[in-house]
């Protein structure tokens, strides 16, 4: 039986106005792939991407923000994008959604204030609100991955389901940007904890990882370094 191909979503991480990739989420260990995030986004759309994942790393770490660049990408490229990084309150989420972003990605705020997720879903609908749980093992990391939260994925997922969340992003921060490949056991655990749409980030290295996701019934992956450096050819074909 042929398994459905998981959706592979190109990621554009934006730091100091450039498209970069971080090693294990460390803002001081960056690789610059494009001097212009707009050029990076345009590159993936030209290759056939129908959806993009943008992360404002400066907003996530409190070092600034890149909202103007993100707004330009949304206006110019004509494909839906989701945006995360520093979306910690209602005003930040509303600003992005009213600017034309297809959906916002809530990270730290979903851990600290799950009610915010429910409020945004009630106002904008579950198709426009996504939660990203960035974790070391099954402990959620917060504030640009710099801190452990003491909250487990197992504790949080039932509350998110109750809030009406449909789509969850899970990132293994210990593998993000490393090309080490996915941890199958961890992926299986998370799949068992979340019964809605599950998108995985962090560690996808090649087609073997895409097959792993298909085998575990995971709907998609956000991929950065592997497609920028060519270890996973894009568009992906198995």
UniProtKB/Swiss-Prot annotation:
Under the heading PANTHER family, the entry gives:
1-(5-PHOSPHORIBOSYL)-5-[(5-PHOSPHORIBOSYLAMINO)METHYLIDENEAMINO] IMIDAZOLE-4-CARBOXAMIDE ISOMERASE
- Which organism is this entry from? Deinococcus radiodurans (strain ATCC 13939 / DSM 20539 / JCM 16871 / CCUG 27074 / LMG 4051 / NBRC 15346 / NCIMB 9279 / VKM B-1422 / R1)
- EC number(s)? 5.3.1.16
Q: Provide the GO biological process annotations.
A: L-histidine biosynthetic process
The protein's name is: 1-(5-phosphoribosyl)-5-[(5-phosphoribosylamino)methylideneamino] imidazole-4-carboxamide isomerase
Keyword vocabulary terms for this entry:
Amino-acid biosynthesis, Cytoplasm, Histidine biosynthesis, Isomerase
The organism's place on the tree of life at top rank: Bacteria
* InterPro entries with a match to the protein in the record: Aldolase_TIM (IPR013785), His_biosynth (IPR006062), HisA_bact_arch (IPR006063), Isoase_HisA-like (IPR044524), Isoase_HisA-like_bact (IPR023016), RibuloseP-bd_barrel (IPR011060)
The GO cellular component terms are: cytoplasm
Reactions listed under catalytic activity: 1-(5-phospho-beta-D-ribosyl)-5-[(5-phospho-beta-D-ribosylamino)methylideneamino]imidazole-4-carboxamide = 5-[(5-phospho-1-deoxy-D-ribulos-1-ylimino)methylamino]-1-(5-phospho-beta-D-ribosyl)imidazole-4-carboxamide
What are the transmembrane regions?
A: none
Compartments where found: Cytoplasm
Task: Write out the similarity annotation.
Answer: Belongs to the HisA/HisF family.
Q: What is the lineage of its organism?
A: Bacteria, Thermotogati, Deinococcota, Deinococci, Deinococcales
Biochemical pathway: Amino-acid biosynthesis; L-histidine biosynthesis; L-histidine from 5-phospho-alpha-D-ribose 1-diphosphate: step 4/9
Q: Which NCBIfam families match?
A: 1-(5-phosphoribosyl)-5-[(5-phosphoribosylamino)methylideneamino]imidazole-4-carboxamide isomerase
What gene name does this entry carry? Answer: hisA
A Pfam match is His_biosynth
